[in-house]
Amino acid sequence: MSRYRGPRLRIIRRLQNLPGLTNKLVESKKNKVSGSDQSIQKKVSQYGIRLEAKQRLRFNYGLTERQLLNYVRIARCAKGSTGQILLQLLEMRLDNILFRLGFVPTIPSARQLINHRHILVNNRIVDVPSFHCKPKDIITIGAPKTYQSILSKRIESFAKDQIPEHLTLSLSEPKKPKGFVNYLINRESIGLKINELLVVEYYSRKA
């Protein structure tokens, strides 16, 4: 299954707000159901609940079905909680790190910057959005000056208290912002509200 490129509002109306996909907020279809309609709503099966959790994770981080399945398999082979390791793997992707630092408004925007070779990790160009960031990595923008100026204004308007503790944003040089990875993210700092165990259960027969 390929990466979704259709209308984003359609997705968040169905799956509720996904910060990585879009910064627009809408009321989900579930909340719009009138009192008379509630009595005729179909009861959601356990499979349906797990499927929705999986879809929320996939669309928020902009993954294909195959990519997410591969991450689940990696998480299953690692020591510790499979669900938490899965979230950690997704959160430490370069495209998500750029988003959490406030460099860009969404993960798709981050992916575009990376694909255009505008992002450096430890002074080396990285053009792979799925690049796994590690503690002590330093992330900078190598874009043209005009583009850098736009990005620096975006970062200045981004509230620093929104940046999770495992990351640090340095604005000592306003036109050359730097992001630092302090350590691997913990569960409390995950930006998406989700029950990761439902995703693990969904893939229990596939991974």
UniProtKB/Swiss-Prot annotation:
MF (Gene Ontology): rRNA binding; structural constituent of ribosome
Domain S4 RNA-binding: 92-155
SMART domains: Ribosomal_S4, S4
Family note: Belongs to the universal ribosomal protein uS4 family.
Tagged with keyword RNA-binding: yes
Database matches in InterPro entries: Ribosomal_uS4, Ribosomal_uS4_bac-type, Ribosomal_uS4_CS, Ribosomal_uS4_N, S4_RNA-bd, S4_RNA-bd_sf
GO cellular component: chloroplast; small ribosomal subunit
Location in or out of the cell: Plastid, Chloroplast
Signal peptide segment: none
Chief localization: plastid
Keyword DNA repair among UniProt keywords: no
Protein's name in the database: Small ribosomal subunit protein uS4c
Role according to the record: One of the primary rRNA binding proteins, it binds directly to 16S rRNA where it nucleates assembly of the body of the 30S subunit. With S5 and S12 plays an important role in translational accuracy.
Subunit structure and binding partners: Part of the 30S ribosomal subunit. Contacts protein S5. The interaction surface between S4 and S5 is involved in control of translational fidelity.
Cysteine disulfide links: none
Entry-linked Gene3D superfamilies: Ribosomal Protein S4 Delta 41, Chain A, domain 1, RNA-binding S4 domain
Superkingdom per UniProt: Eukaryota
Biological process per Gene Ontology, one example term: translation
Keyword terms, alphabetized: Chloroplast, Plastid, Ribonucleoprotein, Ribosomal protein, RNA-binding, rRNA-binding
